Amino acid sequence: ADEAALEVALTIADHANATGTAETSEVRVLCLGPASADDVLRDALAAGATSAVRVDASTELDSQVVAVALAEHLGDRDLVVCGDYSLDRGTGSVPAFLADELSSAQALGLLEVRVPADNTSSALRVVRRLDGGRREILDVVAPAVLSVEGSAASLRRASLAASLAARTAPIETVRGPH
């Protein structure tokens, strides 16, 4: 799901940069975890993320504590895109807690995220899964937190040059909760 979230964020940024709807859209990848998470961050940089930050944490933490720690390091952002499933416990609750921490709108469990084809709307059209196989279509305006399912997008393949550059790219590491 995190790879799908990265692809959604890259697609939104590509669209905004191509259409001039934003000064410059950047994709900043942020994770909370031990040093071994740097490999995943390097993969994200190779795929097109502009910067990566790891909030250092070596122990398993409550989802709300994770959200608070991430919110402290998000900085100025319009949109946060998360995977809807975490590798640790798989609760998918971090995006909801994060939206609360950031006082942002939230759209969770998304199957599809569409950027507007024309520049008449700043809203993203999203499709989310409901119980019983039903779907809900929403228009989401930033600031917002989105969580996407793994099926929402397939991550683009990184070029060899980008992969090699990512191996030595800086990853900012900040102290997290312990």
What residue ranges belong to the model's regions?
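N-terminal beta-strand-loop-alpha-helix module at the start
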Residues: 1-32
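Short beta-strand-loop elements within alpha/beta enzyme cores
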Residues: 76-86
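Short Gly/Thr/Asp-enriched flexible loops that form oxyanion-binding sites at enzyme active sites
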Residues: 89-106
